Amino acid sequence: MSSGGGSRGLLAWLLLLQPWPGQNWAGMAAPRLPSPLLSEEGGENPEASPAPGPEAGPPLNLFTSFPGDSLLCGRTPLRIVGGVDAEEGRWPWQVSVRTKGRHICGGTLVTATWVLTAGHCISSRFHYSVKMGDRSVYNENTSVVVSVQRAFVHPKFSTVTTIRNDLALLQLQHPVNFTSNIQPICIPQENFQVEGRTRCWVTGWGKTPEREKLASEILQDVDQYIMCYEECNKIIQKALSSTKDVIIKGMVCGYKEQGKDSCQGDSGGRLACEYNDTWVQVGIVSWGIGCGR
């Protein structure tokens, strides 16, 4: 999570407003991208052990739940009042995706046995675990750590021209017990729409200054405003000196004045908006232009 001195921090998100195609999820290993925070040297953790490749698909109804369908999802006892460090229990669905105890990406608990993250965070070469229930990325005394049984990367995940379908689901080895610090977030139905200028929130343990090598120890949060598609595309095109449409259907942009946005290590975390006291995940941290620029 970065707080820079630029006039506007810009981040592209992958929308979760449509169910995944019902097809076989065979052998989908994500290519390496620069966004996840994988080791202190900036590369993947050399100690991570191999993991079996992604397997057949998860239940599609994970993507059709809505706040009204469950009294358990999307509720937190704490109100948002601002700040940098997230208060304990403010984001009970926040997950740290890890290899050998090292944080690489964020994630979100969507049921007792499923975690949602970014596709580019997952490789078939590694075993993963998830840590939840504590705002500290390192302290495991008060948190729950569960091994990942299977990983499913979206079958149409691609980095050609632009990043598409950057989603993955992690099936846990056993269900977690819900507590005040461990709760699932709500996932919107397909026809759900996010309006421009909606104030939403992103959280993560990513780098604070862009050039730092280590993740933030304490979970960070920052509010972001949803940007209209056309405006976002123009800004991205200008930044990349390109005339191509980089922002495509299935993406949404978030921005914050004064250069506050996500950074390496925040990938896979969620963009969540509050509706009628219920938190709904509308996007996943996928990619951006620098950190806090």
UniProtKB/Swiss-Prot annotation:
Region (Disordered), start-end ranges: 33-60
Membrane protein topology class: Lipid-anchor; GPI-anchor
SMART domains for the chain: Tryp_SPc (SM00020)
Disulfide bonds: C105-C121, C200-C273, C232-C253, C263-C291
Gene3D superfamilies xrefs: Trypsin-like serine proteases
Compartments, record wording: Cytoplasm; Cell membrane
Stretch forming the signal peptide: 1-26
The UniProt record lists the keyword Signal: yes
Biological process, per Gene Ontology: cell differentiation; proteolysis; spermatogenesis
Broad class of where this protein is predominantly found: cytoplasm
Residue intervals of the Peptidase S1 domain: 80-293
Glycosylation sites: N141, N177, N276
EC number: 3.4.21.-
Keywords: Cell membrane, Cytoplasm, Differentiation, Disulfide bond, Glycoprotein, GPI-anchor, Hydrolase, Lipoprotein, Membrane, Protease, Serine protease, Signal, Spermatogenesis
Recorded GO CC terms: cytoplasm; extracellular space; plasma membrane; side of membrane
Molecular function via GO: serine-type endopeptidase activity
Its biological purpose: Plays a role in spermatogenesis. Involved in germ cell survival during meiosis.
The family this protein is said to belong to: Belongs to the peptidase S1 family.
PANTHER family (UniProt xref): SERINE PROTEASE 42, TRANSMEMBRANE PROTEASE SERINE
Protein name in the entry: Putative serine protease 42
Gene of this entry: PRSS42P
